[in-house]
């Protein structure tokens, strides 16, 4: 089954991007390569149940199992030893990536209280977009009664766009609700 957002990209976004930026080769047209969902857990080193709970919630949201990230080196100030679990990371590609992005844009983001749009200033200089969410409850798959703690997550949308303006236009054509227009 072809995802709705992938169809939108192939049928209209490619033409709009080609027309706007004047690409001659179809391989120059920006596309989304992957989406990385990251959740840092400060309490994971003391409480293994919180790690399991967060893993379950992120797996429900993303549709695939995550990888536990471990501390690379010890930091005494944070009471972290080398090898302790400190977070969860999920990388989405292909149809699952488009399905997640579709749910994020059309279901999750509009459920945020007082939502006016996402910032257009979160591009990294190479066309990739980073978004931080304060709670996982905005996703309809998560039930309020089933969670033990409200956790946030970082979402990184990686594109092969050369500039931020190309990445902005790609996400805008796909329906990302930006607060303001992109300014260099």
UniProtKB/Swiss-Prot annotation:
An example Pfam family from this entry, by short name, is Ribosomal_L5
**Per its UniProt record, what SUPFAM superfamilies does this chain match?**
RL5-like
Annotated Gene Ontology MF terms?
A: rRNA binding; structural constituent of ribosome
Compartments in which it is found: Plastid, Chloroplast
Q: Which InterPro entries does its entry note?
A: Ribosomal_uL5, Ribosomal_uL5_bac-type, Ribosomal_uL5_C, Ribosomal_uL5_CS, Ribosomal_uL5_dom_sf, Ribosomal_uL5_N
PROSITE patterns linked: RIBOSOMAL_L5
Q: Which keywords annotate this record?
A: Chloroplast, Plastid, Ribonucleoprotein, Ribosomal protein, RNA-binding, rRNA-binding
One GO CC annotation: ribonucleoprotein complex
Q: Name one GO biological process term.
A: translation
Q: Is the keyword Cell wall biogenesis/degradation assigned to this protein?
A: no
Instruction: Please give the family membership noted in the entry.
Output: Belongs to the universal ribosomal protein uL5 family.
Summarize the protein's role. Answer: Binds 5S rRNA, forms part of the central protuberance of the 50S subunit.
Q: How does it assemble?
A: Part of the 50S ribosomal subunit; contacts the 5S rRNA.
Query: PANTHER family, from UniProt?
Result: 60S RIBOSOMAL PROTEIN L11-RELATED (PTHR11994)
Q: What is this protein identified as?
A: Large ribosomal subunit protein uL5c
Organism (species): Mesostigma viride (Green alga)
